Curated annotation (Swiss-Prot):
Protein name: Serine-repeat antigen protein 3
Assigned protein family: Belongs to the peptidase C1 family.
Reported function: Putative cysteine protease. Probably involved in merozoite release from the parasitophorous vacuole during liver stages.
Gene behind the chain: SERA3
Residues spanning the signal sequence: 1-21
């Protein structure tokens, strides 16, 4: 509560005390109420001559205190980021009725030469803005070159600016360094970055501001060194600014690479503690121009808006002759299929728990009613505007002829009727019966503890005949719906056994949300007689024998196969002087297409994307990717973990090679082993046997050819049928041919963590690189006494490893998090083969290093296959799910900006104090001289036509008393089903996301979650036609920003029912998650007149 009050106080300061020297005018507000599910909005309007006057203050009667921004015709910017105070908002009735403009022309329109508003816009009288003393305020400097401006005396603030810009902020680079090859620069860069001092203490309220440019499609950013920001030119480019290390990168969405600002020449302006930066980015004549300057900031940098603008103006008009003071890069863009439509600027302030997104609309290229839909989606914090846009059109029952459909993929319009029927159809009766049974059990297993004021689990004393009957019915339904037959031939428990098993699982996951508990109660292990033996049959790793010196000599004397393409690339040899000359023309303009081409050479297969990059990787979050179609496997009651880990690894390699996803047959590999059925199912093995079987048989059929059921493991290898597909084909096993001393392993490479004990960062970087290149890595871990049927999986576990691993899994991704102690750390995302309902949707997370006192790392060994794969006979037909990772132009069809689920978490993490984390954008390391083979230790209002405004979970920001926060955040009459460990009081008052931190547990211990719970307020600003509208979304946990969905964004037409809508979302998400539009599905199930789930 203290932190919540702190957030409110700071926001009040931000909105009430941020003085801006521009005009202030009065304009009607729009939006829902602030009591929950609505939006406070702030409308910013420009006058004909860019001047206006202040009229009144924000108050509870509904009047809004608004601040107009300078008219871009008179100044360099059409908007500033100064915040204004807010009162409670009015209704939408005050807004003019939406009109349907003509269809936008395909070409990029130029900015209007006059700032006079159109007839449909409110026009305010032309008045000269005056200061408190009555003096006129001179217009801000023009964006045009100085020669076109009327000379005027230099003011004192201008003198400060000129003085700040005149002195270079960092030592100049010598001519010798300027002429040095890129290879040399790349070698020097890491060491320079590593020696940097901690960044300066940034301003508690403001550490960065952004402004829209007048004459070009672009923005200006000014801030203190140490901030991490991003600028997105939708729908084509994303720019990264990691100012701590003076790193700027460009990521074209039409290609999966990142281009470094220092690609051609070293950056001269280096950020340092106590310094500030100015960054200009805009597009002119199909040329992307970036300008970067570091300077000593004046004391009134953010207190006086004029100072910031003058500094930015001075940087923006830098000529080529002055490039020695300002770093300038120009990139010729390839031919794009549509113009730039908007620019987003993203920043974070971890000290205040704030995220801010500004959305600048560049041109009116979309009809007004369509624009309102996208604006509402944005103001509710959606990371995928397109999905929200689809949902809104479906809820509005829009006809296929509706003009808004032209901004969505054609598949939705073509399949509109089918989509609607799917949402209206009934679920399978047995499936519904199981969901109902689980709901009854969850309600039965918790009782209100009046003394502790919370819900607590029942005990055996509360066991009765009603519960006994429901437990029997529950397991009966589970067995009938168990397509993997894991309960077949198994000894089922009686009602007492089931009660104890379920009670243990609920204790271990005591703080899990109800939605996740629904999934966990689908785990068939709960119905077993002896649940402790459940995991024993699922382990099955036997380490291969150590390679002897004789075997090493034999391997080195054999004729080697071709090397893996990943090993052929020496990163430092990719860029020589001749190649660089071809990239830059005589005018110093870099050809982006050629720069992209060379950047791709860093890996033949890896494409950097918002779903997998150097900081974060989870390709399963990208629902259009090939890899996301690889399902979680259930190995059943056989010790075949080694087989399923190898199978998944092979399938991700196929996706990364562009051959598409065809599910391979695990049963074929199991039955073609030269062992008996009992030995195969009970004794276990390792990935080397997987490769030996395939290399010998030269065949691997589809799962549909020879489907897997654990009870069908027989030890009898089938004869391939004529209609079977061979996924193995002419695949070759390659030698590991890394540089330096090594043991040659044929078909695989082994990384043992014990040999990296003195340099675990190298081990971690190697595994991350392999995941980026091959989609996954096979890993050996210890599960006995640590991981069992009740393991949580959603929360990051901090566990040690063991010298004798017993299980094989796949590392499929990684990411960063902030620990309870405030330390920046990283985790592995691991996939198991124990079914979708184990862990968290079949996966779990572990800290990459584990506790400080660990003798062994949690990852005992990592293995990757080294194979030269050829496409199978069916890889070019419609049966194979193509690799959308390598068909990025298909994703570019989206009109709206799309972000990954990790986008805001990454933004916050990189701004989090400490800054000690490794840069997420730096290039791969050169591991050529490392021994990696294991022999050395040196190594979101109208029910009929809903157009609600942004979700509001904060107080009226024009009035700042603390009690208003309680009014805005709570509804005393609202009812909610609390999570198991939530107090009754907290549940009643909660109107935000319950992203509870749960226990990272084991079968024998119930350790607390190691991840810090951080409350976040997301401020969203939509700027269009010189008007600004604000939205607010509050998250109880930073991790909520990482989810594909969050029920906190559920919208209620009656604010009193917000908690009810949120609860409905949590309880029914599992039914709708696979629908074309889950939000539409939920809205249809709930009834369209009550809740709206398009923003979820």
């Amino acid at each position: 509560m203290a932190r919540l009050s702190s957030i409110v106080f700071i926001i009040c300061l931000l909105l009430c005390n941020n003085a801006i020297s521009d005009e202030v005018i009065e304009s009607p507000s729009s939006g829902g109420t602030l009591s929950g599910g609505g939006s406070g909005t702030d409308t910013v309007t420009g006058t004909q001559d860019g001047k206006g006057k202040s009229e009144g203050k924000g108050n509870e009667g509904g009047q809004t205190d608004q601040k107009g921004k300078e008219n871009p015709e008179n100044g360099q910017n059409s908007d500033s980021t100064g915040d204004s105070s807010l009162g409670s908002t009015g209704s939408n009735g005050s807004q003019p009725a939406p009109t349907t403009p003509k269809e936008p022309e395909p070409t990029t329109p130029k900015e209007p030469e006059s700032a006079t508003p159109k007839a449909s816009e409110p026009v305010t009288p032309q008045k000269t803005a005056e200061t408190a003393s009555g003096k006129q305020v001179s217009p801000t400097p023009s964006e045009n070159p100085p020669s076109k401006d009327t000379p005027k005396p230099e003011s004192s603030s201008e003198k400060k600016v000129n003085s700040a810009l005149a002195t270079p902020p960092a030592p100049e680079v010598s001519k010798a360094q300027e002429g040095a090859g890129l290879a040399t620069q790349k070698e020097q860069t890491p060491s320079k970055r590593a020696k940097r001092s901690p960044p300066p203490q940034v301003n508690n309220i403001t550490d960065m501001e952004s402004y829209l440019m007048k004459n070009y499609d672009g923005v200006k950013v000014i801030g203190l060194c140490g901030v991490y920001f991003r600028v997105q030119f939708s729908p084509h480019l994303l720019l990264y600014g990691l100012t701590t290390f003076s790193i700027i990168q460009i990521e074209p969405f039409f290609e999966g690479v990142r281009i470094d600002f220092e690609h051609q020449h070293p950056i001269r302006n280096k950020c340092a503690p106590g310094k500030a930066f100015a960054f200009i980015s805009y597009v002119k004549d199909n040329i992307l121009i970036l300008k970067w300057k570091v300077f000593a900031p004046p004391s009134d940098l953010f207190a006086n808006d004029e100072v910031s603008k003058q500094i930015l103006s001075a940087v923006s008009v830098t000529s080529d002759a002055e490039s020695s003071v300002v770093d300038v890069r120009k990139y010729r863009l390839p031919q794009l299929d549509r113009p730039f439509t908007s620019i987003q600027v993203y920043k974070a302030n971890p000290k205040q728990g704030l995220l801010e997104t500004k959305n600048y609309i560049l041109k009116n290229a979309i009809p007004e009613k369509c624009s309102k839909i996208s604006m509402n989606c944005f103001l509710n914090g959606n990371v995928n505007i397109e999905n929200c846009f689809k949902c809104t059109l479906l809820v509005q029952n829009a006809k296929p002829t509706d003009e808004c459909f032209q901004y969505l993929p054609s598949d939705m319009k073509n399949n509109l009727n089918e989509i609607k029927v799917t949402a209206q159809s009934d679920e399978d009766s047995k499936e519904n019966d199981l969901i109902e049974s689980i709901e009854i059990l969850l309600n039965s297993f918790y009782k209100a503890d009046k003394k502790a004021k919370k819900l607590s689990l029942i005990t055996m004393d509360d066991f009765d005949d009603v519960l006994r009957a429901e437990l029997f019915n529950y397991c009966k339904l589970l067995k009938e719906l168990d397509t993997k037959k894991t309960l077949e031939n198994a000894e089922l428990g009686n009602e007492i056994d089931i009660f104890n098993n379920l009670l243990r699982l609920l204790k271990t996951n005591e703080e899990e949300s109800k939605h996740n508990l629904y999934k966990k109660l689908r785990n068939t292990a709960i119905c077993l007689k002896d649940v402790n033996k459940w995991a024993e049959k699922k382990r099955g790793l036997i380490l291969p024998e150590e390679v002897t010196q004789d075997q090493m000599a034999i391997g080195q004397n054999e004729e080697p196969y071709d090397e893996d393409p990943d090993d052929r690339v020496d990163l430092l040899e990719l860029f020589d002087d001749n190649q660089n000359e071809n990239i830059v023309d005589k005018d110093g303009i870099i050809d982006m297409s050629i720069a992209i081409k060379y950047a791709k050479l860093k890996s033949p297969y890896f494409n950097s994307s918002k779903y997998c990059n150097y900081e974060y990787c989870d390709r399963w979050q990208d629902k259009t990717s090939c890899i996301s179609n690889i399902d979680v496997e259930e190995q059943g009651n056989c010790s075949l973990c080694w087989l399923f880990a190898s199978k998944l690894h092979l399938e991700t390699i196929r996706c990364m090679r562009g051959y598409g996803h065809n599910r391979s047959s695990a049963l074929y590999v199991a039955n073609c082993s030269k062992r008996t059925a009992e030995e195969i199912c009970n004794d276990g093995s390792n990935p080397l046997e997987f490769l030996k079987i395939l290399e010998k048989n030269k065949f691997l059929p589809l799962e549909s050819n020879y489907p897997y059921l654990w009870k069908n493991v027989s030890g009898k290898c089938p004869n391939p049928q004529n209609d079977w597909t061979n996924l193995w084909g002419n695949t070759k096993l390659l030698y590991n041919n890394m540089f330096g001393q090594f043991i040659k392993h044929r078909g695989y490479i082994v990384y043992s963590s014990r040999f990296f004990a003195k340099n675990m960062n190298v081990f971690i970087d190697i595994i991350k690189r392999e995941i980026r290149n091959k989609g996954s890595v096979i890993a050996y871990i210890k599960t006995q006494g640590v991981i069992d049927y009740d393991f949580n999986g959603r929360y990051i576990s901090n566990i040690c490893g063991h010298n004798h691993p017993d299980h094989a899994v796949n590392i499929i991704g990684y990411g960063n998090y902030i620990s309870e102690s405030g330390e920046k750390r990283s985790y592995w995302l691991i996939r198991n083969s124990w079914g979708y309902y184990w862990g968290h949707e079949g996966n779990f997370k572990v800290d990459v290093l584990g506790p400080d006192n660990c003798v062994h790392n949690v990852i005992h060994t990592a293995i990757v296959f080294k194979i030269d794969m050829e496409p199978d006979s069916d890889s070019n037909n419609n049966n194979a799910i193509k690799n959308r990772d390598q068909l990025i132009d298909e994703d570019n069809k989206s009109y709206f900006p799309q972000l990954s689920s990790n986008f805001y978490h990454s933004l916050y993490y990189n701004n989090y104090e400490g800054y000690e984390a490794k840069n997420d954008d730096e290039n791969d390391q050169n591991y050529g001289n490392l021994d990696v083979s294991g022999q050395s230790e040196n190594h979101q209002n109208d029910p009929k036509n809903p157009q609600p405004q942004a979700n509001s979970t904060v107080t009226q920001l024009g009035v700042c008393p603390a009690e208003n926060q309680r009014t805005a955040d709570s509804n005393p009459n609202a009812q909610s089903t609390p999570s198991p460990n939530t107090t009754v009081t907290d549940t009643v008052n909660s109107n935000t996301a319950n992203s509870n931190t749960a226990n990272s547990n084991t079968a024998s211990a119930n350790a607390a979650s190691i991840e810090k719970k951080i409350q976040i307020l997301h401020v969203l600003k939509h700027i269009e036609k010189y008007k600004m509208t604000r939205g607010f979304v509050k998250y109880d946990n930073l991790n909520d920003t990482k989810n594909d969905y969050t029920c906190a964004r559920s919208y209620s037409y009656d604010p009193k029912n917000h908690n009810e809508c949120k609860q409905f979302c949590e309880e029914n998400w599992e039914r709708c998650k696979n629908h074309y539009s889950p939000g539409y599905c939920l809205t249809t199930l709930s009834g369209k007149n009550k809740c709206l789930f398009c923003y979820v």
